[in-house]
């Protein structure tokens, strides 16, 4: 993948907002090297979602398909997880550095 600035990356990710919301997401965030501005050419794209557990649990199979679609569109590996699944020892730093997409 060519290096893409954060604004361009966020614009592409926002095109998936409806699909993510239809599958239970209430927010989408970039974290990791692309959020802090130090990606390497081989860096993946780390994303986490928020969801309202009382209204709808994310359809993980559909999220995996969205993850695959994004990987193809961007030309890099994409990993989508939930905020609740973030590692407890790293969660505070991840949340601090995360960039909200939607």
Language model regions located:
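A short, structured beta-strand/loop element
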Residues: 42-43, 47
